[in-house]
């Protein structure tokens, strides 16, 4: 088949495979367009779960007549115009493909009027070439989009739609999320002619909490702790439920927004979970509604087809900022009974780690000594960048927890180091460089073998085999246990009952290898792995390890370490001289027995004498 340009309708339907997953996806895209148009009231009418009708009506700025045809074309948008705009996106939409994709899998009608126009105009696309027809219509200032018979021309997609109730529940959840993101917009949701949800626009903080209670429920509002945290261009606001009173129902409330865009970001979720883990059970999850504001240049939103995920340029900074913000409000909640004391200004600025005391380290700029104020109480009700506690009336709290006396005593105790011992520590004997050495690396052969010279003999060493033995030695606990390295984002996997039982039996042996996990009803969460596995693709390796353990009747640390060493991916597809020398140095240090008695497949002598004799006889 020759290469050819796809027809517009087919190209749009392919794009719709990413944009239009179900009716809720259509609602999300269209409502976000209304928000970008500056609408303050949006009416959403749904029939038969969105399969028959989706109608979005707003009072936004509208679309000019001459731009209606472009609105239904692919890659046409008013949101961005250059690469600089793409790198600093502040609108919800920016790709210019939603309307074209939706119109290719439904009967879409767009009616709009701007304030400058005396009449409205209606546009719809049809046919193989998606030609747009525009005609006059009656309509107030704003836009109405009607999507009829979704997936009518793609029966395979329509067959995979769920029941009417299920699809509407997904739409309802999307509207809930949008209502939490935009308190200043009125949202009305109707299903089959009946008004189901009505979220009126609110302005004051007390009214915001009423909408929060209407969406998330009174139990969440009663346990909600308000947060306001700031550092430079980073701002964190919202509510987190008191972990001591978090229930299974509350744990379903996990909403986070980045610059007003609803997200499902693992980094943010991990930071919140880590801040709450001391007060949460192993099978519990935190409940929160949080809003992160960040410089648009520091976040990339163009990394997911449905824009559900983002990528931060300084992910570690964002993670620690959120972690500290949530941790501080939780500590303030539990430490308000500790006495406060005044502290005289220090003679010079010494940065200190005050995360554990609940102080916002990010919000404290470095101030020259000469510009410092006289001694004042650390606790200040109006300090910017602080964290709030529980609020019943409304308003963001600006209270910042101060220096705690008890924590100061602990801190001073930690500074008291024991006297140095005059007894010298025994020095480990150095390995005999001659007897415990593979020899000198001459060159790399075939990309994965090292040619060695030792005592006038030439040998060929398999670098992948040597690396496997080194990994096994690094994983096998010796006199000191293997150090577990916590994962920035824990790996959560679904397991069967048999796999879960095998993991429970093998847990002591895995712990010796530095693999730490927690399990609940149907899932296991890997929280730490040993250092040699940090750079591995754990989403592939761990399920394979679980499958291996499920097939075993008895467990031994050495056998598990050997299996892992054989199944990890090599970090060096092509070896260099420096990498080979470094590997052999580690093998000689950790596995001296391999030098004395090399196992099969590691070393192969090269017979130079026969080659030399052959040359002499020529």
Swiss-Prot record:
UniProt-listed GO biological process terms: mismatch repair
Coiled-coil ranges from the UniProt annotation: none
GO CC terms: mismatch repair complex
Database matches in PROSITE patterns: DNA_MISMATCH_REPAIR_1 (PS00058)
Any matching Pfam family: MutL_C
UniProt-listed SMART domains: DNA_mis_repair (SM01340), MutL_C (SM00853)
Molecular function terms, GO-annotated: ATP binding; ATP hydrolysis activity; ATP-dependent DNA damage sensor activity; mismatched DNA binding
Family annotation (Gene3D superfamilies): 3.30.230.10, Histidine kinase-like ATPase, C-terminal domain, MutL, C-terminal domain, dimerisation subdomain, MutL, C-terminal domain, regulatory subdomain
Extent of Gly residues compositional bias: 382-392
Alphabetized SUPFAM superfamilies for the sequence: ATPase domain of HSP90 chaperone/DNA topoisomerase II/histidine kinase (SSF55874), DNA mismatch repair protein MutL (SSF118116), Ribosomal protein S5 domain 2-like (SSF54211)
Top-level division of the source organism's lineage: Bacteria
InterPro entries in alphabetical order: DNA_mismatch_repair_CS, DNA_mismatch_repair_MutL, DNA_mismatch_S5_2-like, HATPase_C_sf, MutL/Mlh/PMS, MutL/Mlh/Pms-like, MutL_C, MutL_C_dimsub
Region Disordered: start-end pairs: 371-401
Alphabetically ordered keywords of this record: DNA damage, DNA repair
Family annotation (NCBIfam families): mutl (TIGR00585), PRK00095.1-1 (NF000948)
Role summary: This protein is involved in the repair of mismatches in DNA. It is required for dam-dependent methyl-directed DNA mismatch repair. May act as a 'molecular matchmaker', a protein that promotes the formation of a stable complex between two or more DNA-binding proteins in an ATP-dependent manner without itself being part of a final effector complex.
Family that this chain belongs to: Belongs to the DNA mismatch repair MutL/HexB family.
Protein name: DNA mismatch repair protein MutL
Organism: Salmonella arizonae (strain ATCC BAA-731 / CDC346-86 / RSK2980)
Gene that this polypeptide is encoded by: mutL
């Amino acid at each position: 088949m020759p290469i050819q340009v796809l027809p517009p309708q087919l190209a749009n339907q392919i794009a719709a495979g990413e944009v239009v997953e179900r009716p809720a996806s259509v609602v999300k895209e269209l409502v976000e367009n209304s928000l970008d148009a500056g609408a303050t009231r949006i009416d959403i009418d749904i029939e038969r779960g969105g399969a028959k009708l989706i109608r979005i009506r707003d009072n936004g700025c509208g679309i000019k007549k001459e731009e209606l045809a472009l609105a239904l074309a692919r890659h046409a948008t008013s949101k961005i115009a250059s690469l600089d705009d793409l790198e600093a996106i502040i609108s919800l939409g920016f790709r210019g493909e939603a309307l074209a994709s939706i119109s290719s899998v439904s009967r879409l009608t767009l009616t709009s009027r701007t304030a400058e126009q005396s009449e409205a105009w209606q546009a719809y696309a049809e046919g193989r070439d998606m030609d747009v027809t525009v005609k006059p219509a009656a309509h107030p200032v704003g836009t109405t989009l009607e999507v009829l018979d979704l997936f009518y021309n793609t029966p395979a997609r329509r067959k995979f739609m769920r029941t009417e109730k299920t699809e509407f529940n997904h739409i309802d959840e999307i509207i809930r999320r949008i209502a939490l993101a935009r308190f200043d917009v009125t949202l009305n949701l109707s299903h089959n002619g009946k008004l189901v949800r009505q979220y009126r626009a609110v302005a004051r903080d007390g009214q915001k909490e009423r909408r929060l209670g209407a969406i998330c429920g009174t139990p969440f509002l009663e346990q909600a702790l308000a947060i306001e945290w700031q550092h430079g261009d980073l701002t964190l606001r919202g509510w987190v439920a008191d972990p001591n009173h978090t229930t299974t129902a509350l744990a379903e409330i996990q909403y986070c927004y980045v610059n007003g865009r609803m997200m499902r970001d693992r980094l943010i979720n991990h930071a919140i979970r880590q801040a709450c883990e001391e007060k949460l059970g192993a099978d519990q999850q935190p409940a929160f509604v949080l809003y992160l504001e960040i410089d648009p240049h520091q976040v990339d939103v163009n990394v997911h087809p449905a824009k559900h995920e983002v990528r931060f340029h300084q992910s570690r900074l964002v993670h620690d900022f959120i972690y500290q913000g949530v941790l501080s409000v939780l500590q303030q909640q539990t430490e308000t009974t500790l006495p406060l004391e005044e502290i005289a200004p220090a003679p010079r600025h010494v940065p200190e780690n005050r995360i554990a005391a609940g102080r916002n380290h990010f919000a404290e700029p470095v101030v020259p000594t000469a510009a410092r104020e006289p001694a004042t109480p650390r606790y200040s009700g109006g300090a910017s960048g602080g964290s709030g506690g529980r609020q019943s009336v409304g308003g963001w709290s600006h209270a910042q927890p101060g220096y705690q006396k008890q924590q100061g005593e602990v801190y001073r105790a930690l500074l008291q180091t024991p006297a140095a011992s005059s007894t010298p520590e025994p020095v480990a004997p150095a390995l005999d460089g001659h007897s415990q050495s593979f020899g000198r690396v001459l060159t790399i052969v075939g990309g994965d073998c090292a040619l060695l010279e030792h005592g006038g003999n030439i040998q060929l060493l398999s670098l992948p085999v040597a690396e496997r033995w080194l990994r096994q030695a690094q994983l096998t606990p010796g006199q000191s246990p293997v150090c577990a390295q916590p994962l920035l984002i824990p790996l959560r996997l679904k397991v069967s009952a048999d796999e879960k039982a095998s993991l429970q039996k093998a847990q002591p042996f895995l712990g010796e290898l530095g693999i730490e996990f927690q399990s609940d009803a149907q899932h296991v969460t890997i929280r730490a792995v040993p250092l040699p596995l940090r750079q591995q693709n754990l989403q592939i390796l761990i399920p394979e390890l679980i499958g291996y353990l499920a097939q075993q009747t008895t467990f031994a640390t050495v056998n598990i370490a050997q299996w892992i060493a054989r199944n990890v991916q090599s970090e060096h597809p092509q070896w260099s001289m420096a990498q080979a020398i470094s590997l052999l140095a580690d093998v000689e240090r950790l596995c001296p027995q391999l030098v004395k008695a090399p196992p099969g497949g590691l070393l192969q002598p090269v017979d130079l004498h026969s080659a030399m004799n052959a040359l002499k006889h020529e």
